[in-house]
Amino acid sequence: MNGNQIKQLKKLYRHILNEASKFENINYNVYFSNKAKEKFREFCSDTNFESEKLKTFQNECWDYLNMLKRQTIIHNLYHVDKPLVNK
């Protein structure tokens, strides 16, 4: 894995975390952030970086990012805050 690929993965990781932080509900925010962190830790813990494995991981991450973008839009469109004070 060369330096350019590492930079691309870090950039993709930051995009995923940024998109996950856009959820208005903190529970979704934390869940998707933790899921992304876990995926990247699992991938980086493997010391054998094959180009084919890296490509499939990048494709999975792009799919995950696109899914997050769609879900944040939908969630925030229909998000309803609960009243803080009950009558």
UniProtKB/Swiss-Prot annotation:
Pathway: Cofactor biosynthesis; iron-sulfur cluster biosynthesis
Keywords for the protein's UniProt record, in alphabetical order: Mitochondrion, Transferase
Main localization of the protein described in the UniProt heading: mitochondrion
Subcellular location: Mitochondrion
Pfam families in the record: Complex1_LYR (PF05347)
Cross-referenced InterPro entries: Complex1_LYR_dom, Complex1_LYR_LYRM4, ISC_assembly_LYR
GO CC term (a single one): L-cysteine desulfurase complex
GO molecular function, one term: cysteine desulfurase activity
GO biological process assignments: iron-sulfur cluster assembly
Protein purpose: Participates in iron-sulfur cluster formation (ISC) pathway for iron-sulfur (Fe-S) cluster biogenesis. Enhances cysteine desulfurase activity of IscS.
PANTHER family the UniProt entry points to: LYR MOTIF-CONTAINING PROTEIN 4, PROTEIN C6ORF149
The protein's assembly and partners: Interacts with IscS; the interaction enhances cysteine desulfurase activity of IscS. Component of a complex, at least composed of IscS, Isd11 and IscU.
Family: Belongs to the complex I LYR family.
The protein, known as: Protein Isd11
Organism: Plasmodium falciparum (isolate 3D7)
